[in-house]
Amino acid sequence: MGSGSEGKAVFYLSHCPKPMENPMSAQLKPSEIVRQLSQHVIGQEDAKRTLAVAIYAHFRRMAANVAIDSVELTKSNILLIGPTGTGKTLLCETLARILDVPFVTADATSLAQTQFVGDEIEAILHRLLDRASDDIDRAQRGIVFVDEVDKLKAIGGEARATSGESVQHALLKIMEGAPVRLKDGRHIDTTNILFICGGAFVGLDHILTQTHTFGFISTTGGDDHKILERLNARVKPTDLLEFGLIPEFAGRLPIVTRLHDLTQDMLIRILTEPKNAIYRQFRAMLAADGVDLQIEPTVFRQMAELAIEYKAGARSLRGIFEEMMTDVMYAVPDNPGIRRVVIRSLFERAEMSTG
């Protein structure tokens, strides 16, 4: 295990989906995928590389749509492990935009709370069809991100939570890659739909500590500690079983990669560097009104510190920034003479001037 299209009233059913009509996704090399991801996602370089290689292999397989040298090419779904706010959903959303494929998210916790799991699972495919504008061929090449799958674990590590296990089995039916008949009579083949699952997996590190015994490995040179650290951080199938995933579900997630807590420097970069960075958005909005927005570096550091204190990672940054800008965005429309806004501290009022 690594760490590491649809017209209305179309009834298309095939165990071997048609070759890709737009092969551009298959032409993207892993390095190009990483480059484009990095324009929107700060940090998590290992996860980017793992995802890029997996996506490259996935779309190459779809483009070929045949066995190569008599070797059958099968789909490999992905598991992202990392704390809240580390960028799991953003990575998946950005990947879908880069690849120009329909994308939907699902919350495993919500699935576990319903008495009609099958209906909710079918609803995921219906939403994928909606995102594909009812183009079945396009939907069959989409991406589904199922978050918080760690919440489907067994209770106490022994007796399995019935609802959690039943959701895992229900998800398996669409993850395994087979034609699914929807209640409206249409069929959708999930063979080429890529499923990416995510979760914090709190407590997994304890399992890794207890089950990994790579201390016997010996190397020459000074990299012994780094090698052992990488090996011991690698998630094995048995670790996921110990955590509470059923063998069949864990087996459908052969590619596993970990995301790590964001540092203060990473959070500052998230505020300022990406194409859609919140700072850039507000500068552009105010510039449209002829106002120049300047924020001192200290303010970004203060926002990053607050996000770390909230323990919500990058997810909390927008709320912090929006709150800081409330007074400014309230004042500017009523005062067309304002031409410059300077913010020197997160905890002080902004300076607004006409010059």
Task: Describe each PLM feature range.
Residues L13, E21-G43, K48-V104, A108-G355:
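AAA+ P-loop NTPase nucleotide-binding core of proteostasis motors
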